[in-house]
């Protein structure tokens, strides 16, 4: 593991709730109005709030970017491009969906399969796609695992053509929400918005800073509570978290969560209960929050040490908190967690 330095922060600056932000400014132009415009809607299986200093019509356009993408990548919508491929074994992806597929497969390769877009049948067997939770028989899991192998997906990035083996189901959900937030943010930028915060059910994408020049304050949830444990100061980046607390069920005294290990077909038992990724690319952050959770702390820290495009916050099952060195001057513990020891992972 990379070198870890232990520091204790005894002061805190509670700026906002978990994965939310607020800000004001004195400029009254449309792109930096004194109060943000906002819209709330439900998409991608979560409640979404877009807030921006700009015209509300532009926000509605950003919403359309997201909902249009959702329709194209849904595993269950019979009109989606991904659904068509899963039903027919092949098909052609267009535009942003093709771009998303290319990105997803790149992340599968970079994480050595800790992220795998063909994990859907395993997730379904555990009931996380329907809410009918169950612990599947080991024989069921073993029968499904041979089709969990992203390397068997044939994709031509030039034509968008995709072919998958019989019995395989692909799902871009592990990267789609972060990618959608990124695309929506780019739409806002292209339409003159310089200050915004997009909250996709806890996946946060920021544009610029607040109108007064100060960074956005994004809360990181305590995995064992209902309040933020720390607040990050963020400018023009994405902040995306994967945690075992997000979706889980209990059976016979055991807790099972939705983040699956592609190697075992079981919930990832990596010693981590929460991973937050901060970076410029929302899709990358989304993919890494899941895959680094699967890897566990040591492998995740080594992966970070060999990268230069993201920072991370790790919370272990035992309650230890680790941050990578790029965040050491960008966080503050909340009052309720002021005595928490935070260990800094350095290169």
What are the language-model segments listed below?
Residues 2-11, 15-347:
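Mature catalytic core of soluble alpha/beta enzymes
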């Amino acid at each position: 593991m990379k070198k870890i330095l232990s520091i204790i922060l005894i002061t805190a600056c509670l700026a906002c709730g978990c994965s939310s932000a607020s800000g004001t400014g004195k400029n009254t132009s449309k792109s930096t109005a004194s109060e943000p415009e906002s819209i709330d809607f439900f998409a991608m299986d979560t409640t979404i709030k877009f807030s921006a200093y700009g015209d509300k019509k532009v926000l509605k356009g950003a919403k359309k970017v997201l909902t249009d993408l959702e329709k194209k990548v849904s595993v269950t919508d019979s009109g989606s491009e991904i659904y068509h491929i899963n039903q027919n074994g092949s098909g052609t992806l267009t535009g942003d969906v093709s771009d998303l597929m290319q990105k997803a497969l790149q992340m599968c390769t970079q994480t050595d399969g800790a992220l795998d877009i063909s994990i859907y049948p395993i997730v379904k067997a555990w009931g996380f796609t329907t809410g009918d939770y169950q612990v599947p028989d080991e024989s069921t899991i073993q029968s499904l695992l041979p089709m969990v192998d992203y390397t068997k997906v044939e994709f031509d990035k030039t034509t968008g053509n995709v072919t998958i083996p019989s019995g395989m189901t692909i799902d871009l959900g592990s990267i789609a929400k972060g990618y959608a937030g990124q695309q929506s943010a780019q739409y806002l930028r292209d339409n003159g918005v310089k200050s915004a915060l997009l909250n996709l059910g806890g996946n946060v994408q920021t544009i610029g800073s607040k109108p007064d020049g100060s960074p956005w304050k994004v809360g990181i949830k305590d995995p064992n509570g209902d309040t933020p444990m720390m607040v990050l100061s963020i400018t023009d980046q994405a902040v995306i978290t994967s945690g075992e607390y997000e979706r889980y069920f209990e059976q016979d005294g055991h807790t099972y969560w939705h983040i699956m290990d592609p190697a075992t077909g079981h919930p990832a038992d990596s010693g981590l209960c929460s991973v937050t990724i901060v970076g410029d690319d929302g899709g990358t952050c989304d993919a890494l929050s899941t895959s680094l959770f699967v890897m566990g702390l040591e492998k995740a820290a080594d992966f970070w040490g060999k990268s230069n495009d993201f920072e991370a916050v790790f919370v272990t099952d035992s309650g230890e908190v680790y941050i990578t060195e790029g965040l050491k001057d960008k966080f503050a513990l909340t009052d309720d967690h002021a005595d928490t020891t935070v260990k800094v992972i350095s290169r």
